[in-house]
């Protein structure tokens, strides 16, 4: 085959390849209708359940998010798991202990005698640790969590939760599977370090459904025995082959991990050990922020509510994950002025109450116009204008955004796009009088929240599929 033929073959292959990839995700964000989404799969375990939204749904595919809700019963332990994507987790309800294992970081929590004599001494591997008194444990950082906490977790970082309260612990998590930190396909892939998922990963298209086991299950027991310097019998227990408790298990008796005292406030700093720059960046970096404190809100009006934002300025690890969050709480008939996300997609999850939401796409079509309630999820794509009005005594929500410094622009209000336009542009653009143009530009003095004078009108019907 000559050079000309090779070149022709190369361009033909390239054309076919681009055609194939174009067919893989054609017009992902050409959305003429949005819907309030509910979970499509429930994974039950001994100590709780995981509810998974279908991230192949058009609007979630557009946003790039995979979304999950965790319900962990009292004394339930969500076993260590890591993902192929960075994620933000929000504590909707309850209290918990949380631990994360960041690769290469030291065990900074230690000196707690939690194991008795004889444990860990298998095959002469006790290493002389406290014989007769039991040896002392050490592990990476453990944090107390409460309602309103938002946790940033990089890909590949194993994470666990323990419900140490008396009520169910409810968490929601958004993983950005479209981010370049995910080097696999656009599927959420949990890698289990312990436990299993008897129902399998039903959201993975093209894979035969089968039980999902933990990572150790794939290794030969003899290899594990050599790697951990334990017996083959113990190695087989690591594989959880005959146990179907799921990935959330019930803890029997006391949960004796080393933990700090409960936080007295949000400003406390953990003492840091001397180390190199990498350790200071990854190992001691703060990963949790509480968004339920109105005193630290970005927008606060006692009669209307508050809005708090979380971005890479107040939680620097988000710069690495390229994610941010917004927490909102508004009273009945309060309205969030019409706005759009300048540089991010958003996934809005309702944590309390109800609201009427309208959403408009790039064709000027109303693609969403209905009430949304607790437990439902709505995607707001980049540039789609949205307005929210509370229809219950209190409406609360959390938004996850696909940019670490997500920005909004408002259509009405003191800092809106209309306020920045000359009166002549408004008057001529909408064919209205100068007096009407002044009213459009200057009548609304608020920047974000305002009082609604009544229910949102329906006007022209929304576009139906």
From Swiss-Prot:
The modification Phosphothreonine is found at residue 108. One of its GO terms (cellular component) is rough endoplasmic reticulum. The modification Phosphoserine is found at residues 308, 443. GO terms for molecular function: nutrient reservoir activity. SMART domains: Cupin_1. Residues 34-236, 289-438 form the Cupin type-1 domain. Disulfide bonds join 29-62, 105-283. Gene3D superfamilies: Jelly Rolls. Keywords: Disulfide bond, Endoplasmic reticulum, Phosphoprotein, Seed storage protein, Signal, Storage protein. The modification Phosphotyrosine is found at residue 306. Belongs to the 11S seed storage protein (globulins) family. This is Cruciferin CRU4. It comes from Brassica napus (Rape). The gene is CRU4.
């Amino acid at each position: 085959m000559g050079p000309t033929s090779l070149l022709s073959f190369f361009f033909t292959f390239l054309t076919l390849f681009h055609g194939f990839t174009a067919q893989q995700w054609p017009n992902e964000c050409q959305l003429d209708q949005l819907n309030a989404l509910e979970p499509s799969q429930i994974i039950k375990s001994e100590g709780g359940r995981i509810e998974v939204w279908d991230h192949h749904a058009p609007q979630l595919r557009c946003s790039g998010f995979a979304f999950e809700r965790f319900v962990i019963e009292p004394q339930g332990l969500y076993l260590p798991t890591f993902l192929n994507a960075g994620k933000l987790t929000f504590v909707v309800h309850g209290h918990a202990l949380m631990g994360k294992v960041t690769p290469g970081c030291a065990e900074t929590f230690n000196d707690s005698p939690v194991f008795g004599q004889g444990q860990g001494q298998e095959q002469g591997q006790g290493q002389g640790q406290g014989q007769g008194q039991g040896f002392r444990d050490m592990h990476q950082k453990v944090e107390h969590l409460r309602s309103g906490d938002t946790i940033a977790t990089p890909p590949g970082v194993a994470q666990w939760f323990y419900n140490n309260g008396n009520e169910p612990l409810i968490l929601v998590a958004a993983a950005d599977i479209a981010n370049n930190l995910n080097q696999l396909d656009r599927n959420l892939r949990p890698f289990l370090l312990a436990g299993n998922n008897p129902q399998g990963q039903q959201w993975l298209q093209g894979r035969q459904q089968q039980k999902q086991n933990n990572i150790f299950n794939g290794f030969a027991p003899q290899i594990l025995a050599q790697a951990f310097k334990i017996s083959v019998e113990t190695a087989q227990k690591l594989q959880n082959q005959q146990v179907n408790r799921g990935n959330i298990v019930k803890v029997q008796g006391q949960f004796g991990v080393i933990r700090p005292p409960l936080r007295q406030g949000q400003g406390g700093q953990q003492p840091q050990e001397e180390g190199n720059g990498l350790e200071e960046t990854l190992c001691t970096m703060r990963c949790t922020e509480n968004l339920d404190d109105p005193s630290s809100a970005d927008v606060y009006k006692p009669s209307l509510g508050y809005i708090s934002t979380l971005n890479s300025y107040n939680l620097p690890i988000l710069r690495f994950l390229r994610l941010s969050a917004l927490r909102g709480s508004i009273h009945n008939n309060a309205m969030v002025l019409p706005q759009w996300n300048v540089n991010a997609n958003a996934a809005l999850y309702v944590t309390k109450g109800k609201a009427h939401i309208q959403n408009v796409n790039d064709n000027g079509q109303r693609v969403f116009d209905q009430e949304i309630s607790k437990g439902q999820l709505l995607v707001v794509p980049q540039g789609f204008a949205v307005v929210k009005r509370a229809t219950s005594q209190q409406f609360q929500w959390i938004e996850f955004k696909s940019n670490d410094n997500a920005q909004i622009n408002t259509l009405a209000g003191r800092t809106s796009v209309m306020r920045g336009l000359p009166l002549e542009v408004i008057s001529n653009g909408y064919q209205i009088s100068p007096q009407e143009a002044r009213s459009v530009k200057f009548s609304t003095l608020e920047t974000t929240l305002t009082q609604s004078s009544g229910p949102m009108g329906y006007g022209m019907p929304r576009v139906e599929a």
